[in-house]
């Protein structure tokens, strides 16, 4: 299937890594739909930038922590663009708080916004991908989420991101017979606007590569995983950390 016939849905696509992915896919001829919750101005700017590349852009306000919003989101994209060939889960807030100071509401928020949307959306797009006999699902976790180490300051976030790995491997197993791959990208420190630059620079000494990752580094991995050249890559967890954590 040529890229001009393909449709991508990106959560958290108004800014940062999600925006970078959308712009790259637009340059490749994909139709790009993305959702946003509060970044209305950024969403408008991103949609306009996608259209300058000659691609179709569809920006949809949605709260992917809500199952009904996910249903509306998928239905809208399918109706407007004819289907969904790739789901790219970029949305997911990050919050630092000691586990001993965590609240029930704060704990629930991390799962509602990081893990649950991956399930909500996968169950909605999978039947459409099965029907088209092709599909890609890519989700963002976090570096060392597969190592099960103690994380006293980001416990809820870490466990939610770890859950994405298990969920994605299960989906990969179930969907493989239908020419659908499901993979995870686990970034370390990437300069995407979601974390203060001074905080990133403090971590530089722990990165063997000697520099902070950029949005384009993440985009390159997504670009490969979406390609037909990556058809045999399934259930993988790609570490995008410059060697951090080794």
At which residue positions do the language-model features occur?
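Conserved glycine-rich cofactor-binding loop
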Residues: 14-16
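Conserved glycine-rich Rossmann-like NAD(P)H-binding loop of the short-chain dehydrogenase/reductase
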Residues: 28-45
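Substrate-binding pocket helix/loop in short-chain dehydrogenase/reductase
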Residues: 98-99, 106-111, 203
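Alpha-helical segment proximal to the catalytic Tyr-Lys
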Residues: 127, 173-174, 231
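Catalytic loop of short-chain dehydrogenase/reductase
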Residues: 138-163, 168-177, 189
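Short, small/polar-rich loop/turn modules that mediate ligand/substrate recognition or access, typified
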Residues: 176, 181, 233-235
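C-terminal substrate-recognition "lid" of short-chain dehydrogenase/reductases
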Residues: 214-240, 245
């Amino acid at each position: 299937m040529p890229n001009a016939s393909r449709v991508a849905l990106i959560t958290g696509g108004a800014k940062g890594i999600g925006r970078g992915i959308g712009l790259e896919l637009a340059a490749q001829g994909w139709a790009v739909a993305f959702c946003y919750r509060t970044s209305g101005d950024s969403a408008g700017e991103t949609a306009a930038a996608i259209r300058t590349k000659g691609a179709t852009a569809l920006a949809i306000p949605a709260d992917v922590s809500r199952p009904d919003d996910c249903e509306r989101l998928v239905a809208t994209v399918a109706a407007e663009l004819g289907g969904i060939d790739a789901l790219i889960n970029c949305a997911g807030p990050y919050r630092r708080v000691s586990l001993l100071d965590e609240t029930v509401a704060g704990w629930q928020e991390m799962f509602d916004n990081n893990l649950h949307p991956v399930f909500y959306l996968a169950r909605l797009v999978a039947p459409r991908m099965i029907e088209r006999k092709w599909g890609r699902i890519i989700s963002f976790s976090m570096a060392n989420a597969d190592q099960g180490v103690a994380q006293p300051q980001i416990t809820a976030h870490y466990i939610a991101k770890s859950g994405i790995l298990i969920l994605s491997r299960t989906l990969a197993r179930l969907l493989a017979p239908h020419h659908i791959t499901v993979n995870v990208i686990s970034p370390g420190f990437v300069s995407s606007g979601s974390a203060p630059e001074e905080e990133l620079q403090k971590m530089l000494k722990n990165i063997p590569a000697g520099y902070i990752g950029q949005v384009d580094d993440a985009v390159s991995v997504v670009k490969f995983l979406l390609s037909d050249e990556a058809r045999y890559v399934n259930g993988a967890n790609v570490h995008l950390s410059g060697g951090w954590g080794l």
